[in-house]
Amino acid sequence: MSETKHTLHTPGWVSDFQKFIMRGNVLDLAVGVVIGAAFSAIVGSAVKDILTPFIGLITGGVDFSNLFITLKGPVKDTLAEAQKAGAVTVNIGVFLNAVIQFLIIAFFIFWLTRILSKLSRKQEAAPAAPPAPTKEEVLLTEIRDLLAQKNS
C-alpha cells in the first residue's frame, strides 16, 4: 500500500483543494455566478428605468415602485415616505418589479440556452474530416497496389 507523503509546506488538503477547484464544472459555476450577478444588475436597471415607465404609461401613469398598501401607520403618498414614517406596508410594486425582472431573466436564459444548444448540435452533427494517412499507410497502400498490378 503506497502512502502519499506531504511536506510541511504542501499539506494534502492543498492539492485536494486544487483538484477540486480545477474541475471544469466548478469553474463554470463560478463564472456563471459572476456573470449572473452582473446580468441581474443590468436587467434590474432595464426593468426599473426602461420597462416600468412604459408599463406605467400604458396603465395610466401608475408608478409601480409606489404601489403599496398601508396595513398600519400613517398613510403617505410614496413608499419611501410611508417607510420613513414607520408604516407597515405591503409593497405590491416592488414585488411586481421583481416578477418582471425574473420573467425577463428567465426569457433571456431560455433563448440563450436554446441558441447554445442548437450551436452545439450543429458542431456535433458536422463530421470531422478523416485524418491524413500516415507515411506507413501510404507506403503500404503503394505496395498493395504494386502487388495487385503484378498479380493481374
UniProtKB/Swiss-Prot annotation:
Coiled coil: none annotated. Disulfide bonds: none annotated. The keyword Iron-sulfur does not apply. It is found in: Cell inner membrane. Pfam families: MscL. It is a multi-pass membrane protein. PANTHER family: LARGE-CONDUCTANCE MECHANOSENSITIVE CHANNEL (PTHR30266:SF2), MECHANOSENSITIVE CHANNEL MSCL (PTHR30266). HAMAP family: MscL. This is Large-conductance mechanosensitive channel. The gene is mscL.
